[in-house]
């Protein structure tokens, strides 16, 4: 399986997991010149920008360690770009869904994984 297919599969797992926790999909793979957001979900009135990471082995660290400060900045910039297209600015947060283990079936959801102030 190619890296892109694995990434798409991880995003589908994450989306299904979050939907099971009553989050509603707004958009997948939002892309702009500043970066990409894997999933944009709605949790009640809060808009949630989700970074999805998958690691099947820990030779290069766990899935969470790959969300570097540089990556956080790109996600925040892309989120700001997305928000410009809305009529109102909702409450927002940045979550991470980390998949690990065999086939990435072990899921960890980190709410407020990073903050705009640190990016």
From Swiss-Prot:
Question: Which domain of life does the protein's organism represent?
Answer: Bacteria
Q: Where are the transmembrane segments?
A: none
The terms under GO molecular function for this entry are: nucleic acid binding
Alphabetical list of InterPro entries matching this protein:
Restrct_endonuc-II-like (IPR011335), tRNA_endonuc-like_dom_sf (IPR011856), UPF0102_YraN-like (IPR003509)
Pfam families, sorted: UPF0102
PANTHER family with a match to the protein in the record: UPF0102 PROTEIN YRAN
The family note in this entry says: Belongs to the UPF0102 family.
Q: What is this protein called?
A: UPF0102 protein Nmul_A0195
**Source species:** Nitrosospira multiformis (strain ATCC 25196 / NCIMB 11849 / C 71)
